[in-house]
Amino acid sequence: MKLSKVFLLLLPAIFSGCTNVAGDVARTLEPLSADPLNRAALFSSANAFFTDAGYQCRSTSDTEDFRCRKDLRDIYIHQTHAVVEIFPGDDGGNPLLVTTRWDEGLIPSEFISSQFSNPDVAAFCDYLAQATLAVCRNAS
């Protein structure tokens, strides 16, 4: 009888999910010329690049931000996806590029790395520099 009570008390803890978020270093996108960064060209380039890399992207005109999501792992008990976002800079400053990894499911955070580096974002920064649109710098 006591064992069944303990089991019933632990059952919700077993089936409750865990959400863990890890982020890469934030980057500012600085134009290569003295002219301000063309957001339309930036979002168009970002949409093409990340869509080709397997992300689902959307931009929001009212908040002027851009967001892409890619599923990295989708198994019955655990899902992982990467999110890439471009936000407008403070007070009209340079846009901010942020990437995070979301882990959701039954695997506790003790077994998931808190370190995350998105190789797609590094490749996108190289792409922007080669296209002479912008350069990525680590945000302070």
Question: Which residues make up each language-model segment?
Answer:
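Bacterial N-terminal signal peptides that target proteins for export
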Residues: 1-7
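A broad, structure-centric signal for solvent-exposed, well-ordered loop/edge residues
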Residues: 7-8, 93
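C-terminal motif of bacterial Sec signal peptides marking the signal peptidase cleavage site
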Residues: 14-17
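Ser/Thr-rich, low-complexity intrinsically disordered terminal regions
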Residues: 19-140
